[in-house]
Amino acid sequence: LNGIVFISQALDYQGSTPYVRDNLISFITYVPTMAATALYHGRVEPAPESQAVFLQQAREFAINEYLPALFKGNTIDREEYLAVRNRLSYFTGLSTNYVDRANLRVQGNRFTKELLRDEGITVGRLDSRYTEEVVDQLKGSHFRVLNVASDADFAELRRAKQETYS
């Protein structure tokens, strides 16, 4: 064993997973990653002057505005809801319509499908720089994606297969 590579924030599974019922913290922890992904794919408008400043603003928004809004639940007033929705839409690159439908609760697995939906592609879950065409699971051909697999590894396997069988 030469080392260990940790994938995701699974070191604090209880605190970071959206699969624990009513875990509001999970939505907060994903905002900076979603913001970086949206910025990388050119979905943040207007585009910020600095990536570092933008990501710091996303972190501050998540803690200072988004978290309190989620804790308020259905007692949040309309003005605050709209302000948070608009900022969340800006940082994530998602439409305000989608953020409304999600009731301000954008899950990571849905984000990967929604960000580039208009282009017919999904974003990698383990490395969001990679993309893949959306697979229709009803067609039965979804095994090639496997959560856009281990994105870089999957791309490498395709390259190696071409070299081997060419």
Feature annotation, model-predicted:
Residues 73-166:
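Alpha/beta-hydrolase fold catalytic core
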